[in-house]
Amino acid sequence: GVIGAYRKIHLPYPEPHWATRGTKPFIFDTPWGPVGLAICYDTYCFQELMRYYAAKGCRLYINCTALAKCHGIALGSTTLEAGCITNQIYIVSANLAGTDKYNVFWGGSSIIGPSTNFWEAEYYAGYPFTDPRAIQDKMYTATIDLALATREKFEPNPLIDGGTDFRPAIYKELYEDLLKDPKFQE
């Protein structure tokens, strides 16, 4: 059945011609904990959303995407790996593969997560976008250890009086300052 709906928050060109922006993140509960969901551009260009999900307790992040080769070689895998490392979260990413009328898509569906080698991302299934095997039309599964998704920066740090390394109050002030600029008001 339906567990909810997510509307993509950020729309790259040409999507505003046929879609409207969403305004809310989407987290759903599972027996293994909360899971966050985002779509394509939300993930690759707006890291705040993944960080929000990790801070809310998500150890798994789902990225539905249609990343084409015209977006360059660095955007996809580099962003996913960095998000996995900096937020200490698993990412399940499903990308289109092959060609449509206008685009050639990388493929690169994968399950990426924290490694036992700290500050490294590991591909538990699938391949980076630019790997020649990424174009495979295939469904991937993997057994993952959610204990590796420590999200330590979102937990109390005894070395700084129990506060967290992540400091949303500071970012709130920074964003409130940005909102004074009319170009950022909706």
Task: State where each predicted segment sits.
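Short Gly/Pro-enriched turn/cap motifs at secondary-structure boundaries
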Residues: H17, D100-K101, D161, D165
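Short beta-strand segments enriched in hydrophobic/aromatic residues
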Residues: T30, Y41, N95-G98, L146
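Pocket-edge structural micro-motifs
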Residues: I39, G113, T143
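CN hydrolase (nitrilase-like) catalytic-core segments centered on the catalytic cysteine
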Residues: Y44-Y140
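A short C-terminal boundary segment appended to hydrolase-like catalytic domains
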Residues: T141-E186
